[in-house]
Amino acid sequence: MQVVVRDNNVDQALRVLKKKMQREGIFREMKARRSYEKPSERRAREKAEAVRRARKLARKQAQREGLLPGKKRAA
């Protein structure tokens, strides 16, 4: 993965690199490869993630339909 450094602006190049790595899922993969995960633990984690996604989707849909109040925004 390459990032162009313009005008010796290393901070901006690092931000761009981190954003690219985040989009590609490199941080998640590094965390997963840090230690072995048993297949049963992997299934349990994936199931929990699926449940979390389903709840989030249902909550967003209920907010759109007006059944739940929306997020409170700081003024």
Swiss-Prot record:
Comp. bias intervals (Basic and acidic residues): 33-52
Protein's UniProt keywords contain Ribosomal protein: yes
Sequence similarity: Belongs to the bacterial ribosomal protein bS21 family.
GO function terms (MF aspect): structural constituent of ribosome
GO BP terms in the entry: translation
Gene symbol of the encoding locus: rpsU2
Species this protein is from: Chelativorans sp. (strain BNC1)
Keywords per UniProt: Ribonucleoprotein, Ribosomal protein
Protein name: Small ribosomal subunit protein bS21B
Lineage: Bacteria, Pseudomonadati, Pseudomonadota, Alphaproteobacteria, Hyphomicrobiales
Region of interest (Disordered), ranges: 33-75
GO cellular component terms attached to this protein's record: ribonucleoprotein complex; ribosome
